[in-house]
Amino acid sequence: QRFGAGGLATVAQSGIDLALWDLKGKLMDQPVYSLIGGPCREKALCYVTSDDLDWSIELGFKHFKVSNPAHYDMGIDGLNLVEEKIASAREIVGNNSELMYNPVMSFNVEFAIRMAERLKPYGLRWLEEPLIPTDLEGHIELRKAINWVPLATGEDHHGRWTFRQLVENRAVDVLQPDLKWCGGLSEALKIYAIGEAAGIITIPHAAAASPWGQHFAISMPESPMAEFWMGSDPGIPLEELCPIPGMPMPKDGYIKPSDAPGFGMEIKEEWIIPWDHSDASNNTGKR
């Protein structure tokens, strides 16, 4: 608390928390999903974040999120640019796929309302993180102004208190904590409980692209999809780009986490570089 309920202190807490969950699972010889209630589904449905929609479809994904080409200061040109992109995306993926759009904090309230109006015909599943996370009043105003598209946010909100404010003010429809930034799996479970009590779903940021997110997605009933952020170029199989040894990759639009102890990561001890404690000790008390 001394370092605040969010920001870098919470990000640091996240790494420690995830490591402790992995350790607990290994000590108990159980996958982490068994320690947080067990699986509620055989495999988790994924959506992919990528602008390479043809390649994403070829890989078996059925639901999609695209990036943002505009900032609010672009005015009418920005509106036209985004509508052109979303119209093209909808044509490619068809009407039987969920389509999401992420402005990544690039809008103010006025521009977000205009954009939501423009994108009405394309049946977006949600509009993601249009405003900066500190603008609670803006989120409240925006949610009241548009009722035809759900609002999602949370990857840059840190700690359960910021999510509680969103939920208490009914300023959001989808909570998106990032387990590496929000405080870890322990904090994400508390955020999930806050949302669940209010009838709000939680779909963590990039869950399908991390072991901890995969375990969350398979265990939480009110988490109907898991995001897979695809950083690969077209033609490169996902298995060749797996960032963490032992982590499963999506198949046919679904993800199933490892059932190995902990998060199932295969980290070799020789990869870990010991920290030189003497350097820190020698600087103790120095200003």
Regions found by a protein language model. Name each.
Residues 70-79, 103-111, 128-136, 158-160, ...:
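Short, small-residue-enriched loops and turns at beta-alpha junctions
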Residues 54, 130-140, 196, 281-287:
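Repeat-unit-sized solenoid/scaffold elements
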Residues 42-49, 64-66, 97-103, 127-128, ...:
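Hydrophobic faces of well-ordered beta-strands that scaffold small-molecule active sites
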Residues 117, 123, 134-254, 258-261:
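Shared catalytic-loop signature of beta/alpha-barrel
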Residues 7-10, 129, 204-207:
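Periplasmic-binding protein-like
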Residues 1-100, 104-106, 113-121, 238-287:
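N-terminal capping/lid subdomain adjacent to the active-site entrance of alpha/beta enzymes
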